[in-house]
């Protein structure tokens, strides 16, 4: 069996890591050992922050709904309770969008909530 020299494979692996490290600062962009560590850590941050992004957006939507609900005389929790009682099934993303872009529409929803709570 012929001897296989691994130079081509190693070069390809190194090239792949260095391409992923493009734009990094200092040694992290051109030294294979530092680049590999930096790329691994970047992957960990990316994985974690894909989860955190979902939390952050939900929090933002809640803040926007709360602000709009308070203009209508509700607290956030009373408003959400009223939505459930009125049978309005709308997620927080859509409610936040309506609150920001269609104040008249949000007022109509708030009126239905007010009627359901009365």
Curated annotation (Swiss-Prot):
The keyword Transport does not apply. GO terms for biological process: ribosomal large subunit assembly; translation. It comes from the Bacteria. GO terms for cellular component: ribonucleoprotein complex; ribosome. Gene3D superfamilies: 6.10.160.10, Ribosomal protein L20. Keywords: Ribonucleoprotein, Ribosomal protein, RNA-binding, rRNA-binding. One of its GO terms (molecular function) is rRNA binding. SUPFAM superfamilies: Ribosomal protein L20 (SSF74731). InterPro entries: Ribosomal_bL20, RIBOSOMAL_L20_CS, Ribosomal_protein_bL20_C. Pfam families: Ribosomal_L20 (PF00453). The keyword Ribonucleoprotein applies. Belongs to the bacterial ribosomal protein bL20 family. PANTHER family: 39S RIBOSOMAL PROTEIN L20. HAMAP family: Ribosomal_bL20. This is Large ribosomal subunit protein bL20. It comes from Phenylobacterium zucineum (strain HLK1).
